[in-house]
Amino acid sequence: MWRRLSSPPLPFYLPLNITLYACLISNGLAALFAPIQDCDEVFNFWEPTHYLNHGYGLQTWEYSPVYSIRSWLYVSLHAAVGKAASFIVNSKVAEFYAIRLFLGFSCAACQTRLYSSICRSLNPRIGLLFLTIVIFSPGMFHASAAFLPSTFTMYTSMLGLAGFLDIRGGPKTAQVIMWFGLGAIVGWPFAGALIIPLLVEELVIGFLSQTPGSLVYAILDGAARCLAIGVGADLAALYSVGPLLTRSIGC
């Protein structure tokens, strides 16, 4: 007697729109209710943002012209979000929550992108485990809406890892280098080391598959994108933030 073999059930896959909504709820709650955990966030980022938008604020030695170890680019990007919100609701509280909600939304978009790549490249069950962790993890809850360069680097690292996993249409080496480079240039420089294991794998696969030429081209393409980002960041700091600070200081 012949028995008809049934195919195994497909793994459960949460649609991307539901995933985005779940991440938005979690990160939105963090933006509205999570306390600020680090004094560095207050004095090195919220105070300079207040300075750019309102003309006064406290200054740490790290932003002092004597030392200048921090770039104003990261702060100015978020100050622009707060300034745009002030045109809708003229309130400093509204600016504060607009920036935090913007951070939460950005994190949710990056989480959804990485979840999608994990489900397609690995397995939907692994993607579901990842989603469960990022939604209910206390660390991710606080980091998702934190106004810190390491948070920005976390966003770009998720996008870089998503590009590394997503091999549809071929490897996205240049895109991966660009995302990690953006995180290192604008966010936290030491995070650039995160790309080293990924590049090692790309090098091994490239030489084993006897396609070193395309790999070298992709690496040079990614390096050129990072160079363009670095030049753009310097020009933005020189021609936008620089004159603003000069007028504010009264030089």
Labelled PLM ranges:
Residues G28-A31, F130-S144, M158-P189:
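Membrane-interface alpha helices of multi-pass inner-membrane proteins
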Residues H78, G82-S86, T112-C119, P138-F141, ...:
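Hydrophobic transmembrane alpha-helices
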